[in-house]
């Protein structure tokens, strides 16, 4: 069976219904132009993703998460993936600064949901409902993904706020299971989200690597401590 390898993860088939999702220590930014390896990053992303998936499942969000298979490995359900990234934004940061005349750090009065077509060749362009329809994705499917994404946002924002963390923005991916249900997939980690310390606005995510803001592992470990209440490795 074929192993699928991306920039930060490997998908290793277990059987017809499940994959091992292995998180790598690689970090990339700017469409792979900037690259590095950080020992322990894969473990942190796997454990953080597992924590968030468990939290969401407890709140009724269906995910592809089945269990933890090892330090940097999760067992996940095999899905027919949509070629989309669904991005939810609560605070102005990143590429949103280029599209709205608002300063970085501006708290949006309500979340913004954006759609991006997953394509390395096209650099993941932003699309709308009309583009999605051309790609064979129905408005009903898009609306369901947006509905789930906004519920995820509410759950994570509340959980993180109690731990002194601002959920700035994040991206989600979705797939369809064998019963035709739309299920939350991929990962939820500091690779795919922006997390800021509520007091200092210090980044606790991959922006530390993108913009040389400090030690990536220290930032990820701090996030891990706050969301789990444990020290990494304990």
UniProtKB/Swiss-Prot annotation:
EC number: 6.3.2.6
Pathway(s) the chain acts in: Purine metabolism; IMP biosynthesis via de novo pathway; 5-amino-1-(5-phospho-D-ribosyl)imidazole-4-carboxamide from 5-amino-1-(5-phospho-D-ribosyl)imidazole-4-carboxylate: step 1/2
CDD domains reported for this sequence: SAICAR_synt_PurC
Catalytic activity field: 5-amino-1-(5-phospho-D-ribosyl)imidazole-4-carboxylate + L-aspartate + ATP = (2S)-2-[5-amino-1-(5-phospho-beta-D-ribosyl)imidazole-4-carboxamido]succinate + ADP + phosphate + 2 H(+)
Family: Belongs to the SAICAR synthetase family.
Protein's name according to its UniProt entry: Phosphoribosylaminoimidazole-succinocarboxamide synthase
Keywords for this protein: ATP-binding, Ligase, Nucleotide-binding, Purine biosynthesis
Signal sequence extent: none
GO BP field: 'de novo' IMP biosynthetic process; cobalamin biosynthetic process
Native species: Pyrococcus abyssi (strain GE5 / Orsay)
Gene3D superfamilies, per database record: ATP-grasp fold, B domain, Phosphorylase Kinase, domain 1
GO MF annotation: an example: phosphoribosylaminoimidazolesuccinocarboxamide synthase activity
InterPro entries documented for this protein: SAICAR_synt/ADE2_N, SAICAR_synt_PurC, SAICAR_synth, SAICAR_synthetase, SAICAR_synthetase_CS
Keyword Ligase belongs to the record: yes
């Amino acid at each position: 069976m074929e192993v699928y390898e991306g920039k930060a993860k490997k998908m290793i088939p277990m059987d017809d219904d499940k994959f091992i999702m292995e998180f790598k220590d690689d970090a990339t930014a700017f469409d792979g132009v900037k690259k590095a390896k950080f020992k322990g990053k894969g473990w942190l992303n796997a454990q953080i993703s597992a924590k968030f998936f468990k939290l969401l499942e407890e709140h009724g969000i269906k995910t592809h998460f089945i269990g933890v298979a090892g330090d940097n490995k999760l067992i996940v359900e095999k899905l027919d993936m949509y070629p989309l990234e669904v991005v939810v934004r609560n605070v102005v940061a990143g590429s949103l600064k280029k599209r709205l005349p608002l300063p970085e750090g501006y708290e949006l009065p309500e979340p913004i949901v954006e759609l991006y077509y997953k394509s390395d060749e096209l650099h993941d362009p932003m699309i709308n409902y009309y583009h999605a329809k051309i790609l064979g994705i129905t408005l009903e499917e898009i609306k369901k993904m947006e509905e789930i994404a906004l519920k995820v946002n509410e759950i994570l924002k509340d959980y993180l706020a109690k731990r002194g963390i601002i959920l700035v923005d994040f991206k989600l991916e979705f797939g369809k299971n064998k019963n035709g249900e739309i299920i939350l997939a991929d990962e939820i980690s500091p690779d795919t989200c922006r997390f800021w310390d509520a007091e200092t606005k210090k980044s606790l995510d991959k922006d530390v690597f993108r913009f040389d803001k400090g030690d990536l592992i220290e930032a990820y470990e701090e996030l891990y401590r706050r969301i789990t209440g444990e020290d990494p490795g304990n």
